Design a protein with these regions (language model features):
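Conserved catalytic or regulatory cores that recognize and/or transform ribose-phosphate-containing ligands
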Residues: 1-124
Length: 124
């Protein structure tokens, strides 16, 4: 097997279930998938699941680690269900583009952007 393509996934933590499915589908295609950490529901104990980094005082560290994942990737795939792209995800897109990484989107959000390439699975 030749070197597998490395894909970094970006998207809101509100899409955690869909992100996990997308990771699995891309892995089945033989890709190495880098993404953010998905935590089990029991971890949160009443905390807001979408902003856990802020609550634990580690948002800056987690954001920097994700940028290093983008550095390691061959391409970036954005899970933008319903066209949603939050502030952190937009920052990751901007970073990837500034560093010459191809950026693809699961759903078209702008006619000037590339939509997910045909080799990647549909996610609903």
């Amino acid at each position: 097997m030749s070197r597998p393509k490395v894909v970094c996934l970006c998207g809101s933590t509100r899409f955690t279930p869909q992100m996990l499915v997308l990771q699995w589908e891309l892995t089945k295609e033989g890709k190495i998938v880098l993404s953010w950490c998905a935590l089990p529901d029991g971890y949160f104990k009443g905390k807001d699941k979408t902003h856990i980094g802020d609550q634990e005082g580690v948002k800056e560290i987690v954001d920097e680690v994700h940028k290093r994942k983008i550095d390691l990737a061959d391409e970036v795939l954005v899970l933008n269900l319903g066209g949603y792209i939050g502030e952190s995800t937009q920052s990751e897109i901007d970073y990837a583009r500034a560093h010459g990484k191809p950026v693809y989107f699961v759903e078209d959000h702008d006619s000037s952007e590339e939509v997910m390439p045909p080799h990647s699975p549909e996610v609903s």
